[in-house]
Amino acid sequence: MRRDSRRESGGSCEASAPTTATAKDMIGEIENRSAHLLAIKTDVETQGDFIRFLIKEVESAAFTDIEDVVLFVKWLDDELSYLVDERAVLKHFDWPEHKADAMREAAFGYCDLKKIESEASLFRDDPRQPCGPALKKMQALFEKLEHGVYNLSRMRESATGRYKLFQIPMNWMLDTGYASQIKLASVKLAMKYMKRVSAELEMVGGGPEEEELIVQGVRFAFRVHQFAGGFDVETMRAFQELRDKARSCHEQCQNQQQQQHRTLCRSTAC
């Protein structure tokens, strides 16, 4: 009986351990939440003048250049970072949330496009790198440019009314704005791609690999041409060089086939 009672008492202690741990967790959460709420209350009570100053700055903000929006948003976010919990504190004030969010959206959207365009424009093909990975990298960069313009188009459709209302510049969002720079970057990328394919064609010795390279080059050139709406003079020259190499490779392939056919006919006649 003693053994059983020990087991029962032991089981009772083990069962109570998780309950004690859970209680400690709950106490800790209550204390943390209370401290956070107290910090929010303190900010609401002590930062009122500062927040009302920011409200006036946001409400009166009007821009003609998207770069100025970027600078303003950076400044605003730096100022708001001093609050313990931005959303929780600002909801106690008449904060112009829609305008602040619209400015952030415009600034971040523009910076994202600028980053993509810069990445593509600054790309340098390293001839020491194998051809396959180099071409894949250029394809990946082009897809980023495509997505950037697509996202810009969607953003423009949803944002036009809000941006006009909040005096946020939109000229950078037009087809003649930053999208034109992205398309130019894609054209330059196509030129580098085709030059790499042309250089590689001189090194491969015909066969399926040569044909695959030509197809890759032409397909990429076509995609970029459709996306950008045309090529500049330098890129058109690179395309013509690729086209000439493709014709030359095709003629060589035909000559080899004819030569093989003649050799086969002679051996059969013998």
Predicted regions and their residues:
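Extended alpha-helical scaffold/assembly modules in large eukaryotic proteins
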Residues: 5-6, 10-270
